[in-house]
């Protein structure tokens, strides 16, 4: 079996590529990073380590690398022969990989076996969005192709090693794929197959992503370098846990998850965040605050839905306010957000980026927490 995976970064090698290799696929990584691609072509294997004592490294073999800028025709040929195409490039880059995917699918013969194209991105409906991008580039031709939506979860921190291919990850992983519209399921080890993926995507978004983001933004306020350091602070942990119980109420109300099971899920997530061996930098988790403060993302969306249910999301509002205080000059979105606050004020910034209007109850709740944080900062400095 053959798989083509777009994105030879840490998630691609340490999660998706690893599971595909363990499932029996020959994996070709497609990327524009010369160092990684050349190393893959020369070595044809790499190692994955785990941020936990007593867990051995795994050798991932039968891998290759192709630079899509230098050898686009080769990528097309590989897709034309693939059983599976996956991506882990980031939501904003799906439109960049779509043309090659479209060309490769159109090169397939009508009688060819089905091919599955799965976007393994940190977003809702990633494969459906990728399909739209592929259709906009010329479609799939006569190919027998499926685009099942997926949800993925594994913490892979920023890291540097002498070996450019080595990657270290947490032991936990979750890869959920939707079965709707599939005639059969492609063989992938470690995947959970579900009929309706929406609840699982939102559970992950409103728990893992919400908690991670809040820990990073409050941790940054308190001068913490890593997520595990942040969670050692009583106040950070209190807000994170409180926010996850707020989103937990919402998830139980919407999807009927079992209360005890979800409470255990929350504690498992927090324990993952606390892993000191991950050394997960606050700056990595906090990056791109404009995207994370978007109306359909991990912070504002659950807060709005809780308000619609008559519940004030105080801890979420504090986390949102902390995100509005976040500043990292090396993060362009952080700089843009801070400039907007300086030039137009906090209320206008909330309206522009969070799509929350001045006078809304949620807006006022966030403003109250924003000013509370400002007062708390003054007290810490004095």
Curated annotation (Swiss-Prot):
Keyword check for Oxidoreductase: yes
Q: Name one GO biological process term.
A: mannitol catabolic process
Instruction: Extract the GO molecular function terms from the UniProt entry.
Output: mannitol-1-phosphate 5-dehydrogenase activity
What general EC class does the enzyme of this chain belong to? oxidoreductase
Q: Which UniProt keywords apply?
A: NAD, Oxidoreductase
The UniProt catalytic activity note for this protein reads: D-mannitol 1-phosphate + NAD(+) = beta-D-fructose 6-phosphate + NADH + H(+)
- Please, which domain of life does this record's source organism belong to? Bacteria
Question: Does the keyword section mention Zinc-finger?
Answer: no
Binding of NAD(+) occurs at 3-14
According to its UniProt record, the EC number is: 1.1.1.17
Gene Ontology CC entries for this record:
cytosol
InterPro entries (UniProt xref): 6-PGluconate_DH-like_C_sf, 6PGD_dom2, Mannitol_1_phos_5_DH, Mannitol_DH, Mannitol_DH_C, Mannitol_DH_CS, Mannitol_DH_N, NAD(P)-bd_dom_sf
Q: Quote the SUPFAM superfamilies the UniProt record gives.
A: 6-phosphogluconate dehydrogenase C-terminal domain-like (SSF48179), NAD(P)-binding Rossmann-fold domains (SSF51735)
Q: Name one Pfam family in it.
A: Mannitol_dh
Which NCBIfam families does the record associate with it?
A: PRK02318.1-2, PRK02318.1-3, PRK02318.2-5
- Family as reported in the entry's similarity comment: Belongs to the mannitol dehydrogenase family.
Protein name as catalogued: Mannitol-1-phosphate 5-dehydrogenase
Q: Which organism is it from?
A: Exiguobacterium sp. (strain ATCC BAA-1283 / AT1b)
Gene name of the record: mtlD
């Amino acid at each position: 079996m053959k798989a083509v995976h777009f994105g030879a970064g840490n998630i691609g090698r340490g999660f998706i590529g690893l599971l595909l290799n363990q499932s029996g696929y020959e994996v070709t990584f497609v990327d524009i990073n010369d160092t990684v691609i050349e190393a893959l072509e020369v070595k044809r294997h790499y190692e994955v380590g785990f941020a936990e004592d007593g867990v051995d490294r795994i050798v991932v073999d039968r891998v290759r690398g192709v630079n899509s800028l230098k050898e686009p025709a080769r990528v097309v040929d590989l897709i034309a022969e693939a059983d599976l195409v996956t991506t882990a490039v980031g939501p904003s880059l799906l439109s960049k990989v779509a043309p090659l995917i479209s060309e490769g699918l159109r090169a397939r013969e009508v009688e060819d076996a089905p091919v599955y194209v799965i976007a393994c991105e940190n977003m809702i409906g990633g494969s459906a969005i990728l399909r739209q991008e592929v259709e906009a580039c010329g479609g799939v031709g006569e190919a027998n192709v499926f685009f099942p939506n997926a949800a993925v979860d594994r913490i892979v921190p920023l890291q540097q090693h002498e070996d450019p291919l080595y990657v270290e990850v947490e032991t936990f992983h979750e890869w959920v794929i939707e079965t709707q519209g599939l005639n059969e399921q492609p063989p992938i080890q470690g995947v959970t197959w579900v009929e309706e993926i929406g609840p699982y995507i939102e559970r992950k978004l409103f728990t893992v992503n919400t908690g991670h983001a809040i820990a990073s933004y409050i941790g940054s306020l308190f001068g913490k370098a890593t997520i595990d350091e942040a969670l050692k602070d009583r106040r950070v942990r209190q807000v994170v846990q409180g926010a996850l119980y707020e989103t937990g109420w919402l998830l139980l109300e919407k999807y009927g998850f079992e209360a005890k099971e979800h409470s255990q899920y929350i504690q498992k997530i927090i324990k993952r965040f606390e892993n000191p061996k991950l050394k997960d930098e606050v700056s990595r988790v906090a990056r791109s605050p404009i995207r994370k403060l978007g109306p359909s993302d991990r912070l504002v969306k659950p807060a709005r839905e809780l308000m619609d249910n008559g519940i004030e999301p105080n801890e979420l509002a504090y986390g949102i306010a902390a995100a509005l205080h976040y500043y990292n000059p090396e993060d362009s979105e952080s700089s843009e957000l801070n400039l907007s606050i300086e030039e137009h004020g906090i209320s206008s910034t909330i309206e522009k980026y969070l799509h929350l209007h001045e006078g809304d109850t949620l807006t006022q709740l966030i403003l109250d927490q924003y000013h509370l944080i400002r007062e708390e900062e003054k007290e810490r400095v004095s």
